[in-house]
Amino acid sequence: MGGWSSKPRKGMGTNLSVPNPLGFFPDHQLDPAFKANSENPDWDLNPHKDNWPDAHKVGVGAFGPGFTPPHGGLLGWSPQAQGILTSVPAAPPPASTNRQSGRQPTPLSPPLRDTHPQAVQWNSTTFHQTLQDPRVRALYLPAGGSSSGTVSPAQNTVSAISSILSTTGDPVPNMENIASGLLGPLLVLQAGFFSLTKILTIPQSLDSWWTSLNFLGGTPVCLGQNSQSQISSHSPTCCPPICPGYRWMCLRRFIIFLCILLLCLIFLLVLLDYQGMLPVCPLIPGSSTTSTGPCKTCTTPAQGTSMFPSCCCTKPTDGNCTCIPIPSSWAFAKYLWEWASVRFSWLSLLVPFVQWFVGLSPTVWLSVIWMMWFWGPSLYNILSPFMPLLPIFLCLWVYM
C-alpha cells in the first residue's frame, strides 16, 4: 500500500485481469471494465470511491441484511443496492410483561337493560306517544303547506299509524313459549301411542291365559297341527291363517275385546254415577210411576251450578204430589239396589255384609284380588262342570 502510481502493482489482488468488483482488499486494482485504465489505474485512490469503513455498516443490500459491499453491489449503484434504505419499518412494540399467556375467556356481556335502557323501554306504546308530540309530527309527518303551524292533515295519518301499531306492534312471541306449547301435545301423543301398544297386547295376554287353562302343568300347543294342514308346532295364541285353530283364536280375541269394552263402559257408568251425573229418581214405595204434569213444578234445581234436579216428584193415586230428594252420588246404584231388593227380598240380609266388606282396608282388597288371581285357574277347573247352571240361575233371577 503506497502512494498513487501510474504503474500497476504486483502481488496478490493487484492483477488487473482478474475481475473482483467487490473490493474485499484495500489495495485491489479493478478490471478496466470498472474504470480501471491508465489514466486512473488505482481505484482505491479515487476520491469518489466509498470509504472502506462503510463495508462494516449494517444494512439491507444486494447480498441480504447485514452486508453491504463498499463499492456497490452486483445490482448497480442504486441506493437499495448499496444498502441505503429510505424507509425502515418500525419494530413491533415489546410484549407486555404483566399479561397472562394463552387465550383469555371472553367476558360476559352486560344485560341489555343496563347497556341500552332505551331499547327496553321503546315499545309500541312509547312509539305511539312519541308520535303525538307536535315536534315529532312536524319532522316526520309534515302538515302539507299549513301556515298556522298546526298539523291537522297529520292527525288522520297518526291515527292510522296508531291503529296499525295497535294490531302489529305486539312483540314477537317467545320461542320458549312456543316450544313449551308444542311439548305438551307431543307428550300426550307419545303417552297415547304407548298406551295403545300396551292395550293391543292385552288381548294376546288374556288369550294366552285363556288357553293355558286347558294345559295346566304343560306347554300350550295348538291341536289343529295334526290335521290335514301339515304345519309346524306352534302356540294356540299364534295360529297362522292356514291353521284350523285360526278361527278359534279370532273368536277368542273377539270375545276378549267385547269383555274389555264392557268393563270400560261399566267403569264409565260407575264414574258418572259417583260424580252425580246420573240423576235417577229413587224408587218410591207405593208408586211405580213418575208424573210429568203438575208435579214437575215442585222439582227444584240442584245446589250450585249443576243443571240436574235435586228431587224427584211422583203423583200417587190420591192425587197428592210427593217429592223425594235425589242422592247427589250413587243415585243409579241405589236405584238398582232398591229394585233388586223389591224383586228379591233375601238380598236385604246381605246389607250388613256388604257394608262390612266396603269398609275393609285397601290391604284386604289387594289380598283378595291376589288370591283370586292365584287360585282363579284352579277354581275354574273345579267349577267348570257347574258352568251350564249359570244361565239357568240368571233366568230365574230375572223372571222371578
UniProtKB/Swiss-Prot annotation:
Pfam families given in the database record: vMSA
Ranges for region Pre-S2: 120-174
Annotated transmembrane regions: 182-202, 254-274, 349-369, 376-398
Function: The large envelope protein exists in two topological conformations, one which is termed 'external' or Le-HBsAg and the other 'internal' or Li-HBsAg. In its external conformation the protein attaches the virus to cell receptors and thereby initiating infection. This interaction determines the species specificity and liver tropism. This attachment induces virion internalization predominantly through caveolin-mediated endocytosis. The large envelope protein also assures fusion between virion membrane and endosomal membrane.
UniProt region (Disordered), positions on chain: 1-50, 84-116
Post-translational modification comment from the UniProt entry: Isoform M is N-terminally acetylated by host at a ratio of 90%, and N-glycosylated by host at the pre-S2 region. Myristoylated; this modification is essential for its interaction with the host protein SLC10A1/NTCP.
Residues exposed to the Virion surface side: 2-181, 275-348, 399-400
Location(s) in or outside the cell: Virion membrane
Lipidation (N-myristoyl glycine): 2
Annotated spans, Pre-S: 2-174
Comment, domains: The large envelope protein is synthesized with the pre-S region at the cytosolic side of the endoplasmic reticulum and, hence will be within the virion after budding. Therefore the pre-S region is not N-glycosylated. Later a post-translational translocation of N-terminal pre-S and TM1 domains occur in about 50% of proteins at the virion surface. These molecules change their topology by an unknown mechanism, resulting in exposure of pre-S region at virion surface.
InterPro entries given in the database record: HBV_HBSAG
Applied biotechnology uses: Systematic vaccination of individuals at risk of exposure to the virus has been the main method of controlling the morbidity and mortality associated with hepatitis B. The first hepatitis B vaccine was manufactured by the purification and inactivation of HBsAg obtained from the plasma of chronic hepatitis B virus carriers. The vaccine is now produced by recombinant DNA techniques and expression of the S isoform in yeast cells. The pre-S region do not seem to induce strong enough antigenic response.
Intravirion-side segments: 2-253, 203-253, 370-375
Gene Ontology CC annotations of this record: membrane; viral envelope; virion membrane
Residues carrying a glycan: 320
GO biological process: caveolin-mediated endocytosis of virus by host cell; fusion of virus membrane with host endosome membrane; virion attachment to host cell
Residue ranges, annotated region (Pre-S1): 2-119
Keywords: Acetylation, Caveolin-mediated endocytosis of virus by host, Fusion of virus membrane with host endosomal membrane, Fusion of virus membrane with host membrane, Glycoprotein, Host-virus interaction, Lipoprotein, Membrane, Myristate, Transmembrane, Transmembrane helix, Viral attachment to host cell, Viral envelope protein, Viral penetration into host cytoplasm, Virion, Virus endocytosis by host, Virus entry into host cell
Domain of life of the source: Viruses
Protein name, per record: Large envelope protein
Residue ranges, compositional bias (Polar residues): 96-106
HAMAP family registered for this protein in UniProt: HBV_HBSAG
